[in-house]
Amino acid sequence: MSLLSRIKRSRRTLSLVTALPAALAGMWIAAPSAQAAGLPTPDHVIVVVFENHSYEQVIGSTSAPYLNNTLKAGGGNLTNSFAITHPSQPNYLDLFSGNNQGITNDNCYTPQFSSAANLGSELIAAGKTWGSYNEGLPSEGSTVCTNSATKYARKHNPWFAFSNVPLNTAHTFTQFPTDYTTLPKVSFVVPNLCNDMHDCSITTGDNWLKNNLGAYATWAQTHNSILAVTFDEDDSSHSNHIATVFYGAHVAPGSSTSTHYNHYDVLRTLEDLAGLTTHAGAAANASDIAGIWN
């Protein structure tokens, strides 16, 4: 072999050795976002959304003893959590898809008008399970706008906006599992217009939360499951400052964070807790919630 040939071969070998660490680094960067962020990997996450009350009206209030004395005291409190806008409906869309999808009011829209990415479609595409439990929904998959008899309003159920979220994943609340091990990877629970504190008192909503999800919350602590409780918006009196509390396995009891978070950050965190590597809408540039995990 000539001297020139040996030099060329040495250069190729050096290039390969140099490229290998870079390739390995690329594999690390592409690892699931939940691992990169140091988040836990729960089997299930349930999100409950209440209505139209500010952080100041809820946190520390004697009208919400369960939320404060059990969930907040035993979980993680986001002291600087904010909604995105007013009124209700665009906030739900922001929380579910990282974008209001052009909806800026509470008017009834054509069901499944959007094919944009969202939490439900991302979970399904990744082979994971998704579901919603909608109190007052007349029947599974119903796209009715309202039902006065059951105090139901579709404006609080954003999954109906998306053609890539099957209607049969929108369950009635009576279908909420009694065997919690069968829960979807991520699910939303939406109370009706009274129990979500929209038309009725904070105490009404707090009692509903305890009576309907208290047993699950207790179970979650020892079964790799997490409950998140948040609000769509405030009452327009406190700059959209809202209560957001996490509770269950992996959540440090009595923890809190003063970092500024909003619905996009909550969505990003839900995606990453589920081990997704995709992020819908503004969640792509949002931050994972930190400071409350064990």
Feature map (PLM): residue ranges:
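Flexible, surface-exposed loop/gating regions in the mature catalytic domains
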Residues: 37-294
